[in-house]
Amino acid sequence: MKRHRISIPYVTDQVLRNTSDVVDPNDTVDQLISDDVVNPKQDLKEFLDSRELNYRTRASLASSYDDDDWADSIVDLSQRPHNKMEESSLHDDKAIKQATQLNTDYNQLRSPNANSIGGQSVIKDVSSERKPPVNQIPEDQQIYPSQMYPLLEVPESYHSLIPKLQFFFKYYGLYEDSDYVVDKDNQGYYFYPTKKWTTRDQKELMDNISKGVDHDDNLLDLEEKTSDNLFEENLNVHQLVDFVTKGFYVEKRNIKGKYYFDINNPSLNINKIANVDCQDKILSAKEKIDMIFKASGIYRAMKLKAKW
């Protein structure tokens, strides 16, 4: 029987020193993305396809793109404020009890008569003053949609969707910080930006909408102002900008929600959407939604396997 010899190549010092041909895949992807951004001749579709391909390459190992089981691995971010509040309240209760006991013992030692309470200080039990839950609107406080600037409104029966939406908003940076509130009747959830987008000057907003009309400093109720043709279609406004400011319903399987886009939020890239040449085209609602989500950078993540 003839014996076959197998040659095994060994790594030499020369091979280890010769690293000029080694290419880092991460650098390649970054270079492709930078080329897509700085190249003005590139078509919008090619740019979006390349971004989607890069996203799929980077996220293929971390996500299954399954709309049913993907939400199970998402942490419910709404529980964090409650847990922190409960922990802080427990620590506050312990601290208050300890301070009360120490002050009582100290005052009893200083008092000439043990039965006299003249030298004892009255300590207010702060623990009895409970703050309302973070995600609950107080009943005595009137909240208008114009104050919350809701991005998404979903009914109470679809509460399982809330963690996934929070994950999308935070991960893709739609807002600096996203949270939701529950109305006082527990009939719906309202997503709204909690930090800098809620500090918008309401008086300036009212002056821009209806000039020459006196208003008080109360918040503007957008639902009541719809009868005054607040969102009346303007031929001078780009159709996509006009479309996103009105709001639109989206049905994702059995989940229905109404999306509102604030044109004053630069994170949604309204200018980029408006620069898309579609003035001479009649776009359907689905095509508009596709263009909006593609330009805002969340089309692939929000779509998954669902049908818009």
UniProtKB/Swiss-Prot annotation:
It is found in: Virion; Host cytoplasm. Phosphorylated by host kinases. Phosphorylation play an important role in facilitating trimerization and possibly P-L complex formation. Keywords: Chaperone, Host cytoplasm, Phosphoprotein, Viral RNA replication, Viral transcription, Virion. The keyword Phosphoprotein applies. Transmembrane segments: none annotated. GO terms for biological process: viral transcription. It comes from the Viruses. Its main location: virion. One of its GO terms (cellular component) is virion component. Homotrimer. This trimer is stabilized by binding to the L protein. Binds N(0), and N in ribonucleocapsid. Essential component of the RNA polymerase transcription and replication complex. Binds the viral ribonucleocapsid and positions the L polymerase on the template. May act as a chaperone for newly synthesized free N protein, so-called N(0). Plays a role in virion assembly. This is Phosphoprotein.
